[in-house]
């Protein structure tokens, strides 16, 4: 127990986490200590890494053909394709399905054997950590997963550092073991929240948005470490909590600017019974190009986005004059848009034990074919 008046000796070392195969299948905290009750992680001979030590910058130009990782979730594979080595964010308020969607992605992608998986729980519920652990254990995926937790009951130091610690270990496996990494973080907003708490304790003056004065550079440094080089790739999926459902919040915008694609979950969509509750008009991706997804997928995406925008404008007109007053062409487009929205609804595998409904997965070709059928 630490208390006032105790003697403190400085070791001259930073916070170091264990590395290597001994960490796979284990649950660690921000300091690299085990949380799973399965004994110590390694021994005194286990190599350790300073979590703040940045890897040497690559001098090689890493140009590789984009590789799409299929998730089996239609709305993601179509609107925000999961591209190896890139960053995708799931943005939404409380209770709209961010964690469920993340767990489904872990379940679907990790089973494909696409690489070593990392899951980092930052400031989230302990219950969700237990559920994820049980899900991975049942699917026999722990043997290919590293887990870090700094849950909401922990002090702000643990919550602020746990993301950095997990990134440091991911860098080790990428650079030393030449592994491709799938990095899942839930929730990046809690990282900012934890740093805010630390800034308040230290008496720092907040910036104009009410956040820690150095938060922009702190987030930038962390995001820059989630990158690929000639040794391997880090593909990251991050959830971002939206306080009071305000997507214009400075912290949300700050993280969003670091991402290649954003999946926006909406309470209004969830209230319609659509799962996953994705707002199709606000969801966007810079990776949705002909060079990455191909001409067929790209042309369909342009047609679908145009139809969905028209659907939103027609909804306002229908509220005033009724659907029967629309022209035949508008009625046809309105009906197609409603079919498309329903087409992107699907049951999740990770929810099967809760609701008894079997989950479904679809290949990208199946998704494109179903959309072509609706648009025909």
Regions found by a protein language model. Name each.
Residues 1, 172, 190, 200-376:
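Conserved catalytic/coupling modules of large nucleotide/cofactor-utilizing molecular machines
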Residues 18, 22-23, 166, 356-363:
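Glycine/charge-rich, flexible interdomain linkers and switch-proximal surface loops
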Residues 6-8, 15, 22, 35-86, ...:
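P-loop NTPase nucleotide-binding/switch module
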Residues 73-96, 100-254, 261-265, 269-270, ...:
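Switch/coupling sub-region of P-loop NTPases
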Residues 28-29, 40, 120:
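Non-catalytic accessory segments flanking P-loop/AAA+ NTPase cores
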Residues 21-32:
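Short, compositionally biased
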Residues 12-17, 33-34, 94-95:
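Short, charged beta-turn/beta-strand-edge "cap" motif at the junction between a beta-strand
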């Amino acid at each position: 127990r630490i208390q006032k008046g105790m003697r403190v000796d400085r070791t001259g070392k930073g916070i170091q986490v264990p590395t290597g195969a001994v960490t796979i299948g284990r649950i660690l905290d921000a300091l690299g200590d085990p949380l799973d009750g399965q004994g110590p992680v390694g021994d005194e001979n286990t190599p350790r890494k300073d979590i703040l030590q940045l890897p040497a910058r690559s001098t090689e130009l890493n140009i590789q053909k984009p590789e799409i990782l299929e998730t089996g979730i239609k709305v993601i594979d179509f609107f925000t394709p999961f591209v190896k080595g890139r960053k995708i964010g799931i943005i939404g308020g409380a209770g709209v399905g961010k964690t469920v969607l993340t767990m489904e992605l872990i379940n679907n992608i990790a089973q494909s054997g696409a690489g070593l998986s990392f899951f980092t729980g930052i400031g989230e519920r302990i219950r969700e950590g237990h559920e994820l652990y049980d899900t991975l254990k049942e699917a026999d995926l722990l043997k290919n997963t590293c887990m870090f937790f700094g849950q909401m009951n922990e002090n702000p130091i643990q919550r602020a550092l746990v993301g950095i610690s997990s990134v440091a270990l991911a860098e080790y496996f990428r650079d030393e073991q030449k592994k491709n990494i799938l990095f899942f973080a839930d929730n990046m907003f809690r990282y900012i929240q934890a740093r805010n708490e630390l800034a308040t304790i230290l008496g720092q003056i907040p910036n104009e948005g009410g956040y820690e004065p150095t938060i922009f550079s702190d987030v930038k440094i962390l995001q820059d470490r989630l990158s690929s080089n000639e040794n391997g790739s880090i593909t990251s999926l991050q959830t971002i909590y939206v306080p009071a459902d305000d997507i214009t919040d400075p912290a949300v915008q700050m993280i969003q600017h670091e991402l290649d694609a954003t999946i926006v979950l909406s309470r209004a969509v969830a209230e319609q019974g659509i799962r996953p509750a994705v707002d199709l008009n606000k969801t966007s991706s810079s990776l949705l190009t002909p060079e990455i997804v191909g001409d067929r997928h790209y042309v369909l995406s342009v047609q679908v986005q145009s139809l969905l925008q028209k659907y939103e404008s027609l909804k306002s007109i229908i509220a005033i004059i009724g659907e029967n007053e629309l022209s035949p062409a508008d009625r046809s487009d309105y009906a197609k848009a409603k079919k498309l929205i329903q087409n992107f609804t699907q049951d999740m595998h990770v929810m099967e034990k809760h609701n008894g409904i079997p989950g479904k997965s679809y290949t990208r070709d199946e998704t494109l074919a179903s959309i072509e059928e609706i648009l025909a």
